[in-house]
């Protein structure tokens, strides 16, 4: 489950129309949310509030079972009003629980209007951990409608302090460009003098006005190819990885995502397949293989969403039209049979014409458009049901053949509180035990 400050950053991105799904860093989020979720350890309780539409603060207490109580203080400020912000009482669980990502790359790039030109938003975030007094901070500044600068910093106590250096400081710089067709990130990490470059390109989208317009502004399928390059100036170490992502909606409206990731330096290849079979269920699998060690692993997982007892459960399958209505529904008002000028000239002569073939081709074109429109309506109906469904809880489960562990996590809402609890079960035949267990409670106003 997203923490309070992570949720605020998500609200800021949605308000400023910044799509994180179009960045290489988040290309594997659909599978990672189910197969790599983090189980809370110990007990953690956080209380957050909003003093204004621009200022937010949070305080949390945590006990990891070592007899010591830790805490943190956080502050968040933005120049843009977060109109989509909701408290823990009113927030939908879809907004705070990581699950399948409905990737919808826009068909055009965003541009500022004259009124928005002077309103390039930015945010500031800071957190202090107690009693260690370690600190972390983040700043995001939107430079243009499709470019932003992100700065992250961490200051922690040095585990081996010296008279001249008792703290460790690390800064990270991100220059991100996000367009409908591609995205790019230039990264620098000060701790190891590490330089990085990420790039993601989307195939199959076109805004050429001469092309036939799409049936709907939503993309039924998207193929993306991305790569990242790293170079450590201090240790002279390179890094390289590339990922292919295909996300689509089937004819029944169920979204699916397939990814293929490769790291040639480490010799690792991994594939993931995720599909949302209905509004309540998502299935996911991942296969890893290493060419150097010949080791492999298979990980499978799922998440199950639940409604309240008194809530109206939406039907996961849209109601189809009656057969007679489907046969008669042809949008002729949008498509007319038009003969070119040269055909009109030929009609003056007495040459035989094959008008039946022309009419058949036009009819098939109309039927194809009709089928496409029905598919898009089905997809939109399925998507809206996911966004508007009154979920009350979600259960996540994954297991790995190599590690012999089963991870369980339950996330939900009780009154005005957001709850997250889970455990990790070790199924070793010699010594089966519980490796980890925790509970996290959040409240915001």
Swiss-Prot record:
Family per similarity comment: Belongs to the MDM10 family.
UniProt keyword terms in alphabetical order: Membrane, Mitochondrion, Mitochondrion outer membrane, Transmembrane, Transmembrane beta strand
Highest classification ranks of the organism: Eukaryota, Fungi, Dikarya, Ascomycota, Saccharomycotina
Function: Component of the ERMES/MDM complex, which serves as a molecular tether to connect the endoplasmic reticulum and mitochondria. Components of this complex are involved in the control of mitochondrial shape and protein biogenesis and may function in phospholipid exchange. MDM10 is involved in the late assembly steps of the general translocase of the mitochondrial outer membrane (TOM complex). Functions in the TOM40-specific route of the assembly of outer membrane beta-barrel proteins, including the association of TOM40 with the receptor TOM22 and small TOM proteins.
Domains: entry comment: Lacks alpha-helical transmembrane segments, suggesting that it resides in the membrane via beta-sheet conformations similar to those predicted for other outer membrane proteins and porin.
Protein name: Mitochondrial distribution and morphology protein 10
Membrane topology per record: Multi-pass membrane protein
Subunit description: Component of the ER-mitochondria encounter structure (ERMES) or MDM complex, composed of MMM1, MDM10, MDM12 and MDM34. Associates with the mitochondrial outer membrane sorting assembly machinery SAM(core) complex.
């Amino acid at each position: 489950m997203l923490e309070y400050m992570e949720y605020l950053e998500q609200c800021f991105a949605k308000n400023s129309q910044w799509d994180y799904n179009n960045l290489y860093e988040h290309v594997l989020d659909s599978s990672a949310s189910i197969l790599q979720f983090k189980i809370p350890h110990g007990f953690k309780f956080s209380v957050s509030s909003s003093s204004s539409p621009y200022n937010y603060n949070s305080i949390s207490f945590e006990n990891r079972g070592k007899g010591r109580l830790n805490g943190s203080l956080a502050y968040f400020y933005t120049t843009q009003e977060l109109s989509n912000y909701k408290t823990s009482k009113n927030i939908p669980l879809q907004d705070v629980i990581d699950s399948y990502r409905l990737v919808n790359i826009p068909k055009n790039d965003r541009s500022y209007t004259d009124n928005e030109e002077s309103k390039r938003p930015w945010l500031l975030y800071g957190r202090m951990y107690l009693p260690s007094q370690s600190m972390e901070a983040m700043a995001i500044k939107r430079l243009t409608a499709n470019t932003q600068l992100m700065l992250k910093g961490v200051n922690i106590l040095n585990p081996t302090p010296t008279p001249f250096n008792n703290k460790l400081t690390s800064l990270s710089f991100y220059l991100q460009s996000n367009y409908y067709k591609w995205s790019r990130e230039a990264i620098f990490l000060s701790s190891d003098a590490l330089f990085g470059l990420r790039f993601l390109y989307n195939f199959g989208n076109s805004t050429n006005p001469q092309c036939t317009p799409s049936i709907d502004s939503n993309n039924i399928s998207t193929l993306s190819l991305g790569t990242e390059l790293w170079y450590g100036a201090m240790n002279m170490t390179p890094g390289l990885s590339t990922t292919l992502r295909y996300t689509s909606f089937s004819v029944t409206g169920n979204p699916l995502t397939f990814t293929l990731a490769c790291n040639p330096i480490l010799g690792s290849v991994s594939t993931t397949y995720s599909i949302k079979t209905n509004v309540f269920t998502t299935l996911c699998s991942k296969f890893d293989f290493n060419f150097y060690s010949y080791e492999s692993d298979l990980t499978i997982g799922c998440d199950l969403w639940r409604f309240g007892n008194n809530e109206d459960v939406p039907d996961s399958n849209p109601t189809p039209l009656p057969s007679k209505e489907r046969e008669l529904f042809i949008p002729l008002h949008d498509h007319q049979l038009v003969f070119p000028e040269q055909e009109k000239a030929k009609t003056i002569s007495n040459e035989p014409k094959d008008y039946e073939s022309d009419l058949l081709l036009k009819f098939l074109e109309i039927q194809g458009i009709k089928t496409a429109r029905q598919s898009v309506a089905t997809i939109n109906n399925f998507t809206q049901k996911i966004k508007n469904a009154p979920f009350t809880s979600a259960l996540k489960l994954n297991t790995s053949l190599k590690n012999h562990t089963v991870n369980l996590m339950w996330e939900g809402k009780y009154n005005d509180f957001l709850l997250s609890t889970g455990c990790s079960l070790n199924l070793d035949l010699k010594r089966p035990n519980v490796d980890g267990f925790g509970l996290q409670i959040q409240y915001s106003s």
